[in-house]
Amino acid sequence: MPVDNKRIPGPEITQPVVLREEKRLRKPLISREGLRQDGRKEDELRPMFLRSGVVSQARGSAYIEMRRTKVTCAVYGPRESSRQQEFSQKGKLTCEFKFAPFSCWQRRQHMQDSEEKEFSSFVVQALESAVCLEKFPKAQIDIYITVLENDGNALSAGIICASLALGEAGIEMYDLVSSCSLIQKGSTSLMDPTFLEGVSPEVDGRVTVAFLPTLNIVSGLLQDGELAHDQAVKAVKSCMEGCARIYPVLQESLVQAVKRTMKSKQQDAS
């Protein structure tokens, strides 16, 4: 195949300029005043913006923004499963969790890596307990989560976004799924960690919880690093409390989505 010598091909691997960020990496996680690098307290969550109906072609969609963490989700289905799959009385959830190539410090590949596959499986595990899958025999619901910018806690943001997208799609659910994450540094827990906090060498471990607040059910639990038993139990309880604080925002976003849908139907009818 002839080579176009006039074309300048882009590099396969790129890295942004992070000189200011490198200085922040050398700072301690907690200042003398008891504040984190972004000015939050240990148990303080980042401000959250959540909105549904951002992808017109999808059955349901949502967008979440937690300062510099930005995630979008699109839901398609229920649709008939492939003939190769065995008949099941319950429907099936599938998820593709993907970091956009430009979302992280290092350029991500177009193919799913091991981390993205692990996150995809965890999202399915977290949402299966909330969706009434018995209502959709021999059908599947496809969830596509894309991280547009990753400044930490992208997995929890993806679960929250997917939960709202399922609700907007009209999928019957037992409850909305909220999610929260924290990192542990000795006896100190930092809720909703940023990317810099998550990669700090001072961190002992990380816990991510998916929680159904109304039913009081933990639908997903993911732990990395080394934590003592007492620390792990305390971390899970703290994440559950964080999920409960996020839940009203999730509920209000779904209410606003329903209002917009009803208003649109009334305008079409008139």
What are these regions (language model features)?
Residues 1-270:
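Polyanion-binding surfaces on beta-sheet-dominated domains and ring/shell assemblies
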